[in-house]
Swiss-Prot record:
Superkingdom per UniProt: Bacteria
Residue stretches in coiled coil: none
InterPro entries (alphabetical): Nitroreductase (IPR029479), Nitroreductase-like (IPR000415), Nitroreductase_HadB/RutE (IPR050461), RutE-like (IPR023936)
Residue stretches spanning the membrane: none
Source organism of the structure: Escherichia coli O81 (strain ED1a)
Up-regulation conditions: Up-regulated by the nitrogen regulatory protein C (NtrC also called GlnG) and repressed by RutR.
Cysteine pairs bridged by disulfides in the record: none
Protein name in UniProt: Probable malonic semialdehyde reductase RutE
Amino acid sequence: MNEAVSPGALSTLFTDARTHNGWREPPVSDETLREIYAQMKWGPTSANCSPARIVFIRTAEGKERLRPALSSGNLQKTLTAPVTAIVAWDSEFYERLPQLFPHGDARSWFTSSPQLAEETAFRNSSMQAAYLIVACRALGLDTGPMSGFDRQYVDDAFFAGSTLKSNLLINIGYGDSSKLFARLPRLSFEEACGLL
């Protein structure tokens, strides 16, 4: 049986963690980005399909390529973030299933149903984005996930000629707590859950 993590760890990962809009100076190293992926990749996906593909934008040139896709409310926080991750999904993720899930012909489950392939890729890449957020928090970083952007523009600017499609953006860095909004409420257990 696994041991529960400490209350302090739960606070870091969930109860005290915030979505950040402002950032402090320290950069995020490429080694740290590699460590984020090294942790998040172990999160479960259906049939181990692992459809997420991530572009970590950490240069001014990369941010300028992204700028036209951003909504006005997300512009400044993204341009000043040390890193912005484009979390995309690979529409042909199933081509890696002989390696990732070598139990029967899992590839055929998706080649025979494009709708199932798309639903699976989008759903599981969304889960992987959540794992990325938790990995960042576990490594002492803050995040700011966003869906307010022009996905078609991002796909054309970053993924033209590929099988990748953007899902969401996540700003990554060391947050400036002085720029946080007041903490918003969450639904109670009774409002969000049922017991049968």
